[in-house]
Amino acid sequence: MPTYKSLTLILTIALMTVGTATADVTKSDQKQSAMETMKIATISKMYQQDIDEQGMSNPAVLQQYANTELQAAMTLEQAYFDKNQMSCNVDYDVLWDSQDPDYTQDKKLSMTEQGLVQVSLAQGSDIYYELSCDDNDKDCQIADVILDDDGKTLRKHLLEACR
């Protein structure tokens, strides 16, 4: 009989441990899902503002949603323009991957496995955003925009080209 009680005790402890591990995984999945929802909501809000203002926001809508590092790179670009009367920025609207954006085109927002927000535009372009989020404020900011398949980013481009 003591063996039976020992076995029951071991099984009970094992099931409690599995239950706790499952709860931790569920909490982690929920936190990940909430973070993804926050990221997509931020990008969706940014695009809606750009559509509403037809790209005429001042400062630019991307700068309004950027974190401090990306804002600093964008400020560097403005200083370069003021000094040299020429742009060191990319020569198109990054949000729409176009020089003449179609604000009415359909777009689809999704998450990549790398945690980037992907915006797939009806014109066939995909734009990828890296966001930094603060759990406490339920707020996300754009840390960078991936410009090409080689992984070149807007922030890196501005820091290199606008010196």
Predicted regions: what they are:
Residues 24-27, 74-125:
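Surface-exposed, charged secondary-structure patches
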Residues 31-57:
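Short, aromatic-enriched amphipathic alpha-helices that serve as compact interaction elements
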Residues 8-17:
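Bacterial N-terminal signal peptides
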Residues 55-83:
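Short, well-ordered alpha-helical segments enriched in acidic and aromatic residues
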Residues 127-135:
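Hydrophobic/aromatic beta-strand elements that line small-molecule binding cavities or substrate pockets
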Residues 112-114, 125-126, 144-163:
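Low-complexity, intrinsically disordered terminal/linker segments enriched in charged
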Residues 1-8:
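Bacterial N-terminal signal peptides that target proteins for export
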Residues 19-23:
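Sec/Tat signal peptide C-region and signal peptidase I cleavage site
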